[in-house]
Amino acid sequence: MTPMRPHLPDPKQAEGPYRPFTSDPGWPEAWWWLGFPLLVAVFSIGASQIAPDWYRSYALPEGYGIIEVVHFVIPLLGLLIAARLLFLPFVRARPMVFAVAAIGAVSCLYIAGEEMSWGQHFFHWNTPEYWALVNRQDETNLHNTYAIFEKTPRSLLEIGIFIGGLVIPLAAPFAPWLRAFRMSLFLPPAALVPTALGAVLFKLIDRLHQGGYSTLVMRPSETIETYLYFFILAYLIVFARRIKELEAAEGAPQK
């Protein structure tokens, strides 16, 4: 009996054997998956140390600072990718794949909307008095009201990034099946390790900052958010590429 030819990890394919994706980013693409995390660290630390007044005046301000604009643009790009996936027949035929794309789209929409207070930072409308009573920054957003709208989803995201962005990629060389089983489509690639590592390191810096220790960067929580949002965007980029690879394989003649 001729052994079955390994196919790509497709949640719709209940039986293996499976083979790893070949579209995941490698070293030729390090300019973005490694370059951006390094750029964020160099910019945050360098500007805080060399030009603290400039960093405070132009990078950190709510609504129009460089970092705030980046925090709006990154999830907006993620929203475009995730929303496009929702209309693909391949995705709609796979409930789990559709669910992940939908969660990605909703998450990116929420983040982008919240970062700009759903347009308040663009159009400068006044916050209704009843909403100002519950919003600690007098803005028309949810994340400055109750913990369930900010701390809870952020904690879940941080845990997910630690496990998916560090634990799984570092374990994969010792457990190759992680890249070649039915659900491998959903696991972050090794290319996301630098972003996850940046989020963890600046989280430690933020804890020191909260403890009253002098740190290398002002408001490290803003840098953490940059890493968190970029992780989502990078994950969606790879997720879309893997789906494209699956689509191509599905349309290829079987040998």
Question: Where do the PLM segments sit?
Answer:
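Interfacial segments of alpha-helical transmembrane regions
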Residues: F90-L109, W177-L192
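Hydrophobic cores of alpha-helical transmembrane segments in multi-pass inner/ER membrane proteins
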Residues: H71-R84, E158-L170, E225-I243
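Transmembrane alpha-helix/helix-exit interface in multi-pass inner-membrane proteins
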Residues: L109-E129
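Hydrophobic alpha-helical transmembrane segments
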Residues: E139-G164
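Alpha-helical transmembrane segments of multi-pass integral membrane proteins
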Residues: W32, P37, P189-K255
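Transmembrane alpha-helical insertion/packing segments
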Residues: P3-V69, E222, F231
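Membrane-interfacial, low-structure loops and terminal tails that flank and connect transmembrane helices
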Residues: T2-P28, V91-R92, F174-L187, E245-K255
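Juxtamembrane "helix-exit" motif on the non-cytosolic side of transmembrane helices
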Residues: A47-Y58, P173-P176, K203-T215
